[in-house]
Design a protein with these regions (language model features):
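Gly/Pro-rich active-site loop or hairpin
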Residues: 1, 34-38, 42, 60-112, ...
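Active-site acidic/histidine proton-transfer and metal-coordination neighborhood
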Residues: 1-53
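Alpha-helix C-cap/termination motif
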Residues: 14-18, 47-51, 73-74, 107-111, ...
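Hydrophobic faces of well-ordered beta-strands that scaffold small-molecule active sites
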Residues: 22-24, 52-57, 78-82, 115-118
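Intrinsically disordered, low-complexity regions of eukaryotic proteins
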Residues: 27, 120, 138-141
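C-terminal helical cap(s) of enzyme catalytic domains, especially alpha/beta-barrels
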Residues: 126-145
Length: 145
């Protein structure tokens, strides 16, 4: 925890000096990642917690309950990364995976937070981008009506 806290402190000081916003992202629970939920982030951040900004990536949360918990209890969320996931792959197109956006979209939309759509698209045809745009238009933002 000490090394990570010192690294966070240094990054935050550098960002402040440059007047550049910075946020820390809670990562997916895979072997190499350490900060995988809000409790670990708060513990590691320690005295930095009260002025720290966070990016919430819904694909990194183990289930919808964790997304809602983090959305409602994390202070100072700067933005939301939206993508889906399967049991074996993170950051799949929004309509392809285990994430129930029908359950999440009312809370996400009510938050008023900026939404970032996963930008990973290996082909020049922009298939993932097109799938995400279609899903957002036909399914996700439909909750607003």
């Amino acid at each position: 925890d000490g090394y990570m806290h010192a690294s966070m402190k240094e990054l935050m000081a550098d960002a402040d000096e440059r007047n550049q916003p910075i946020s820390f992202e809670i990562m997916e629970p895979v072997g190499k990642e350490f900060i995988t939920d809000r409790h670990v982030l708060e513990r590691v951040a320690g005295d930095l917690w009260e002025r720290m900004y966070v990016t919430l990536d819904v694909a990194h949360c183990r289930d919808e309950e964790m997304v809602l918990d983090h959305l409602n209890k994390l202070p100072r969320i700067r933005k939301l990364h939206l993508s889906n996931r399967t049991e074996r792959q993170y950051h799949t197109p929004l309509g392809e995976g285990v994430r129930d956006f029908g359950k999440l979209s009312p809370d996400i939309l009510a938050s008023g937070l900026p939404i970032v759509i996963e930008g990973m698209d290996l082909g020049l045809e922009r298939k993932v981008l097109k799938k995400n745009i279609t899903y957002l238009k036909e399914e996700f933002f439909d909750e607003m009506e």
